[in-house]
């Protein structure tokens, strides 16, 4: 893994978060470099700036290195992005009093004069971000968006025009382009939450824009809901909860249990919390954590059941380190005799990892694509 960032005279040491990941993944990409080069070559001065979707702080660290008092407003939906940026600022002895942190639901400041963004994988979420910007940016404000060249097309430029203002793309550099959008100063209304029902379980679901499986039950969750374990569980963790559908069903099946919902996405945790309330479940039994797996779960929480539908993407990167960390955290936090109950694509071979960690693994159910596995501490 390359950790030495060297662009436009800026030298940094940058790590992904957590730092112990696959050696072929690094904390920035060529689109980050392209954005920084564009700013430096254009002679950009330190004005109030929003940095959005900065995976591990490459952009905020670079601007802080250029000008230590550059006023930066950093927006992220991912807890790991926040923690990664924080660690990289500390590692490079950069100031942090010039930084203000925002989630993707917080109101952005009204004095922004520049926006730097990375194009996220979820374009519904991206459109939502543009609409949020339209509510605070003055006419003429410049928004620079870095992306892979193959991701930029006429349809994407139309999204800019619809939700923020006219846009054009730069020439390609290292297979990336920078889109320059000029705000038209016209505020757009934010989209309503997506809502849908799962009638067979009597559940009403709502999703914010950056939540996986936005308007339907994904196939992995479906097979999981049909094969939840039997038992008198007292403390349950829905790890990587998304909209919380597994934990919601668990609350129906195990009414005496406290359910803890955990996700790296703040929008996912907010969606799970809203769904808990909307399905009229007891407020004192639902607990919600925006966290990197179970890193900061309170010490007194000892689950006897962990439900998990692990992701195998972190941003644009395909990686199994998140699943591995989830399994490690489950083994560490489960009480003796507690159960880890997971669903995954068959080809990911999670049974090998569970057997290695727990010294046992049982196949509960499977179909052509997915398998449900169970391991006991």
UniProtKB/Swiss-Prot annotation:
EC numbers on record:
2.1.1.174
Q: Which UniProt keywords apply?
A: Cytoplasm, Methyltransferase, rRNA processing, S-adenosyl-L-methionine, Transferase
Q: A single GO CC term, please?
A: cytoplasm
State a single Gene Ontology molecular function: 23S rRNA (guanine(1835)-N(2))-methyltransferase activity
Location in or out of the cell: Cytoplasm
The main location class comes to cytoplasm
Q: Which reaction does it catalyse?
A: guanosine(1835) in 23S rRNA + S-adenosyl-L-methionine = N(2)-methylguanosine(1835) in 23S rRNA + S-adenosyl-L-homocysteine + H(+)
Sequence similarity: Belongs to the methyltransferase superfamily. RlmG family.
Role noted for this protein:
Specifically methylates the guanine in position 1835 (m2G1835) of 23S rRNA.
* Name of protein: Ribosomal RNA large subunit methyltransferase G
């Amino acid at each position: 893994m390359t950790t030495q960032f060297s662009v436009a005279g800026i030298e940094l040491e940058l790590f992904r978060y957590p730092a112990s990941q696959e050696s072929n993944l690094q904390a920035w990409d060529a689109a980050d470099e392209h954005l920084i080069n564009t700013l430096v070559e254009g002679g950009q001065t330190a004005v109030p700036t929003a940095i959005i979707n900065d995976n591990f702080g490459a952009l905020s660290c670079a601007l802080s290195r250029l000008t230590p008092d550059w006023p930066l407003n950093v927006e992220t939906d991912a807890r790991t992005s926040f923690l990664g940026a924080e660690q990289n600022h500390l590692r490079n002895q950069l100031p942090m009093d010039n930084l203000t942190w925002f989630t993707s639901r917080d109101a952005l400041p009204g004095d922004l004069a520049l926006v730097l963004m990375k194009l996220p994988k979820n374009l519904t979420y991206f459109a939502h971000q543009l609409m949020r910007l339209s509510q605070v940016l003055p006419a003429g404000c410049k928004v620079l968006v870095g992306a892979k060249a193959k991701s930029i097309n006429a349809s994407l430029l139309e999204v800019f025009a619809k939700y923020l203002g006219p846009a054009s793309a730069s020439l390609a550099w290292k297979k990336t382009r920078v889109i320059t959008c000029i705000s038209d100063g016209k505020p757009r209304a934010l989209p309503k939450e997506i809502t849908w029902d799962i009638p067979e379980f009597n559940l009403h679901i709502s999703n914010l824009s950056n939540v996986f499986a936005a308007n339907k039950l994904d196939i992995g969750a479906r097979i999981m809901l049909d094969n939840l374990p039997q038992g008198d569980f007292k403390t349950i963790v829905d790890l990587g909860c998304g909209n919380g559908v597994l934990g919601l069903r668990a609350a129906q099946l195990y009414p005496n249990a406290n359910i803890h919902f955990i996700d790296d996405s703040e929008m996912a945790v907010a969606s799970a919390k809203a769904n808990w309330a909307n399905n009229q479940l007891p407020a004192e039994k639902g607990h919600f954590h925006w966290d990197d797996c179970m890193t900061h779960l309170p010490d007194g929480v000892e689950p006897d059941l962990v439900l998990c539908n692990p992701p195998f993407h972190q941003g644009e990167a395909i990686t199994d380190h998140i699943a591995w960390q989830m399994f490690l955290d489950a083994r560490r936090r489960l009480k003796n005799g507690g159960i880890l109950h997971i669903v995954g694509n068959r080809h990911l071979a999670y049974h090998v990892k569970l057997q290695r960690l727990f010294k046992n693994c049982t196949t509960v159910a499977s179909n052509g694509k997915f398998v449900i596995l169970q391991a006991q501490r």
